[in-house]
Structure formats: structure tokens, C-alpha cells
Amino acid sequence: MSSAATIKQRFGLVGRSDIYDRALNTAARVAATDLTVLITGESGVGKEVFSQIIHSLSSRKHNKFIAVNCGAIPQGTINSELFGHEKGSFTGATADRKGYFESVDGGTIFLDEIGEMPLDTQSYLLRVLESGEFIRVGSSQSQTTD
């Protein structure tokens, strides 16, 4: 397990406080698990940096990492972006497309600004987080992701 000092050195982090060191030590501890992690905090406090630290210290470190700002994705396309879509499922869907969850399978996805998502998308997201299952837009087939 990495100590706060080791993590700071490895990732070029600066700062000194007991709370900061505890947060870094917690990141190292959760990186050793295969659990979904919720990182909370105000905008600009480094949630994405912590997610990258957790990914880099985890067994998933050799797989993809993707950070998604959910607040920047238009409401009409967010389900397609996250879960993918089938050819012909809407105007302009000329081919099947993998969503972020499918393309990062086995890796790490960091979802920022999830509170900005439409409520129906949040319920789809909850299903993915609970069971790893999702359905592409325009499909009736359930798929799984890790």
C-alpha cells in the first residue's frame, strides 16, 4: 500500500494537512478493492485527480481510464454517449456505437457532475453501478460491463 508521501511524490502533488493525507491514504486503500467509489466535493477540489490516483494504484491500471463531464453532454444525447446506441435507433444513428461504459469495460470511468444528468439517466446509471447491466439506446438486449 502506498503512503500519502509516496503518492504525493509519484503524482506531483503538494500540500500538507492531516485531512489531505488521510484522503490520499483512503484513495490507496480503496484502490486495492474492486468496489465502485463515490468521490464528493465542490467543483475544483481535485475529484478527478483522486480518481486517477485510485485507477493508477488499482489492478485496473493497465486498462482504460476515462473522465466524463456529464454536465457538458447535451440532454438529448447523454444516454447514447454513456450506454451506446444501435444503428437506426434515432435520426443520424447510421451505425452501432459503443458508449463510454462499454468502451471502458475492465477499466475505470470517472463521472463528474452526475447531479446535472436527467433523472431518467441517473436511474439507468444506478442500474449499471448496482449490477453492471445496461441497454444501448434502441436495443432490447441487456449487456454487462465491469
Label the predicted regions.
Residues 1-25, 32:
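Conserved ASCE P-loop NTPase core motifs with emphasis on AAA+ ATPases
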Residues 20-24, 75, 94, 98, ...:
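Amphipathic alpha-helical transducer elements in NTP-driven molecular machines
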Residues 22, 53, 81, 124-127, ...:
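Alpha-helical transmission elements in cytosolic ATPase-linked domains
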Residues 88-95, 130-137:
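Short gly/ser/thr-rich secondary-structure transition/capping motifs
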Residues 64-66, 96-106, 110, 118-124, ...:
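AAA+/SF3 P-loop NTPase mechanochemical coupling elements
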Residues 12, 25-91, 102-118:
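Conserved post-Walker A coupling segment in P-loop NTPases
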Residues 31, 118, 129-130, 137:
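Protein kinase-like catalytic domain
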